[in-house]
Amino acid sequence: MTRVIKIEKNGGPEVLQIKNVQLPELPPDQVLIETKAIGLNYIDTYHRSGSYPVPLPSGIGVEASGIIKKIGSKIKNLSVGDNVAYGGLPIGSYADERIYPADKLVKLPDGITFEIAASIMTKGLTVFYLLYKTFPVKSHDTVLFHAAAGGVGQIFCQWAKSLGCKVIGTVGSDEKVTIAKKNGCDLVVNYSKENFVEKVMNFTKGMGVPVVY
């Protein structure tokens, strides 16, 4: 038996229930993971509330890290004892142990803690997709990122700067201005006080930006 957090109906935090469940037999292409850290994401609240409907009853959570306790018979590239992390479906990371597809796991390099891994997988993969797939940036591009002080925004600002970009970020408070600057924004606009379009055009000398995230 293992403990998991389940929802049987949609609602607020009160619908989260700790359940003891029996895990099924391990499929040949999956592994059993002992959870060490869980990433909390805003999408978890959407699944819980029903804003993003999921079949009920359901587990919750899309991101975690841990240690492999058992491997399926077809697994060749992972071993018992490996430290791994994941970010994405299937839902159910709020659990002491869980079974998860091996091909969706990332083996953790030395020096990356469980806590760091569980906090950046989903957000980091989102930033990778934005910078390399949605609009592949080039060095010296000036880019605009809304919500620059959020979890995704902080990673985005650091990553884009490492690629040689100039980063303009928008935030909603003075406190968040400080956070965005700390993470590399060249210009931070508090949209509750300032017109970000005017600020962007002034900063770019009327050229604008090739992409807005």
What spans do the regions from the language model cover?
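A glycine-/small-residue-rich N-terminal strand-loop-strand element
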Residues: 65-90
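Mid-domain Rossmann-like dinucleotide-binding core that forms the NAD(H)/NADP(H) cofactor-binding site
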Residues: 121-194, 198-199
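Residue-level recognition of short, solvent-exposed, well-ordered loop/turn junctions
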Residues: 27, 79-80, 138
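N-terminal Rossmann-like NAD(P) cofactor-binding module of classical short-chain dehydrogenase/reductase
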Residues: 85, 144, 189, 210-213
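NAD(P)H dinucleotide-binding glycine-rich loop of Rossmann-like/cofactor-binding domains
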Residues: 86-147
